[in-house]
A protein has these predicted regions:
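Acidic, polar low-complexity linker/tail segments
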Residues: 27-33, 309-362, 369-377
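N-terminal segment of the mature folded domain
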Residues: 34-168
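Periplasmic-binding protein-like
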Residues: 119-128, 167, 201-207, 215, 249-277, 291-314, ...
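Ligand-binding pocket segment of bilobal, Venus flytrap-like solute-binding proteins
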Residues: 186-259
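Von Willebrand factor
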Residues: 356-419, 427-470, 498-509, 530-531
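VWA/integrin I-like adhesion module and closely mimicked acidic/polar interface patches used
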Residues: 435, 471-523, 533-535
Length: 539
């Protein structure tokens, strides 16, 4: 919602976790992992395929310069760090280099020791960015702030914030582990036993109850904040700084950065080469590494709001970190110690099933005649990955006992509506979908309007709500897009509609829905199952 406002899973299962593909938000185009055209040149003799966190998209001007000067194509694939870690565990890694947000994802995923020449390109802490006037009223301006200080303001109803999913994005994961560490009293290391502490569980649930919008991407969280009306967000310092630059241009109130002193986590942006025996690619990678690590380019990277050493900021770049925004440039960063991989996965499993704010999701699914055959079978297969809990657990998308799920199946009318509370009855929804056969037209807006009515029956403040629409065609019911926009706004708005496009879906209309509701469009043509996983990762 917008405002100014289980037990331990097996390590083997969780190592298959799939996070969301990450890319910049295009209003009228489905999300993909495509790269900037300035980086790819078919005439260049060597192409490096790089799996990268979305936060590195801001550095594309530097990468484009390198590509042009060295005649090396850079094919950037923006993905979640957990997804990059998973790819490193494959027998054939589909990339020449990886650039996740944190070294821990290489350490966890690279069991075959394929990655070499790893270098930390920059570092950035994960911080709170809070509207300056609110931060001042909370007493945070100019103060040392602890995680418990923040928890107190959430419990008093004074603070809500946006944050990426801990199971889908490194910034969310890092912040979450920092919260756990601080709430446990800054132990030497987080253990499996400490995660079962009743006091910790109560506190972390209370803290995460303050999340009013979730995201699967750190870069898109910035976009969401700029387009919406929110009090605060947890994100990389570099993205808070670039958000403030945009807010400054728009004449809007900036965010004040708060660095929780007892739960600070750091992204170290490691770039590593995946050794698959190609000498030309290895040579090209080393040129890229040397370029990024050169003194000149490191200074340029600082101008993007990224620190290039734990010792602080170069004097000529101090203006990027404005004191009025709460930037701490003279303080030595003291990050928390991350838990070992098994405890990390257990913590993420608990986040998904017990700790995070429960999801409230309405799946609005197209069963019109054009979905006959392969399309409907793909849809059923995709929903199996979300609703059948053993499969969902492999992707860290399993349901919690307090979440609510609805399905609305439509063609030329709303054919079926069904609800399921918790993480057991949810599988009954899949069986209903499995029995459905496509026929008829596409009354898409009527179905979406019905979903809004269904969700209005819930106390939305207790959930992270979302509508996930899947369609393969043009709406041809009695309600048109403008009719739906009026209805959406009259009902208060605030519920994002994430669309999955398939076949002949009307991308312009889906893009307008995304813009209206501060959501995204995902491309289901390449892989419908993966598109549903991505969309679900946003709530």
């Amino acid at each position: 919602m917008m405002n100014r406002r289980a037990k331990k899973l097996s390590l083997l299962c969780l190592l298959l976790a799939v996070a969301l593909m990450i890319s910049a938000c295009g209003r009228q185009q489905p999300v993909s992992s495509g790269t900037n055209n300035e980086l790819v040149h078919s005439s260049y003799p060597v192409t490096l395929r790089i799996a990268s966190g979305s936060e590195n998209k801001e550095l594309e001007p530097l990468l484009a310069r390198f590509a042009k000067d060295n005649r090396i194509s850079l094919e950037m694939h923006y993905k979640g760090s957990v997804d990059i870690s998973r790819d490193l565990g494959l027998s054939k890694v589909p990339y020449d280099a990886v650039w996740p947000a944190s070294s821990m994802w290489i350490s966890i995923g690279d069991t075959g020791h394929k990655v070499k020449y790893t270098e930390s390109v920059s570092i950035t802490p994960v911080v709170f960015g809070i509207r300056e006037s609110l931060a001042r009223s909370l007493g945070f301006v100019g103060s040392r702030v602890s995680v418990r200080d923040i928890l107190g303001k959430i419990q008093s109803g004074e603070l809500t914030f946006c944050m990426t999913s801990a199971t889908q994005s490194n910034s969310g994961c890092s912040a979450y582990i920092g919260f756990l560490y601080a709430l446990l009293g800054s132990p030497d290391i987080i253990t499996s036993e400490s995660l079962q502490n009743p006091g910790l569980q109560k506190d972390i649930q209370a803290l995460l109850s303050g999340v009013d919008r979730s995201s699967g991407s750190s870069e898109w969280l910035k976009t969401l904040f700029l387009e919406g009306d929110f009090d605060a967000m947890v994100n990389y310092e570099s993205l808070i700084l670039s958000t403030n630059e945009e807010l400054d241009k728009q004449g809007r109130e900036p965010l004040y950065m708060v660095y929780p002193y007892d739960g600070l986590s750091i992204s170290d942006a490691p770039l590593g080469y995946v050794d698959q025996g190609d000498g030309k690619k290895e040579e090209a990678f080393l040129k890229l590494r040397d370029f990024l690590m050169s003194r000149e380019v490191q200074a340029e990277i600082q101008r993007y709001g990224r620190r290039t050493g734990f010792e602080g900021i170069l004097p000529e770049n101090k203006e990027v970190w404005r004191e009025a925004w709460g930037a701490q440039t003279d303080t030595i960063l003291s990050p928390i110690r991350m838990p070992d991989s098994e405890v990390l996965w257990e913590a993420l499993g608990l986040y998904q099933t017990q700790f995070k704010k429960p999801s409230l999701t309405a799946y609005v699914l197209d069963f019109s005649g054009s979905m006959r055959g392969g399309p409907s079978e793909q849809l059923k297969g995709a929903m199996a990955e979300i609703l059948l809990q053993e499969r969902a657990a492999k992707n860290l998308l399993q349901a919690s006992q307090h979440e609510e799920n609805l399905i609305l199946l439509f063609s030329d009318e709303l054919r079926k509506t069904e609800k399921a509370a918790g993480n057991v009855a949810i599988e009954d929804l899949y069986r209903t979908i499995e029995r459905e056969s496509p026929a008829g037209g596409t009354a898409m807006y009527e179905a979406l309007d019905a979903a809004l009515d269904q969700l209005a029956a819930y106390d939305l403040g207790q959930y992270t709500p979302a509508i996930i629409l899947m369609t393969d065609g043009m709406a041809n019911g009695n309600m048109n897009l403008n009719d739906f926009k009026r209805s959406y706004e009259s009902k208060g708005g605030g519920i994002p509609i994430f669309s999955i496009s398939f076949g002949n879906a009307d991308l312009d209309a889906l893009g307008e829905l995304a813009a209206l509701t501060h959501a995204r469009v995902f491309d289901g043509d390449r892989d419908l199952v993966d598109a549903f996983r991505k969309a679900k990762g946003y709530n």
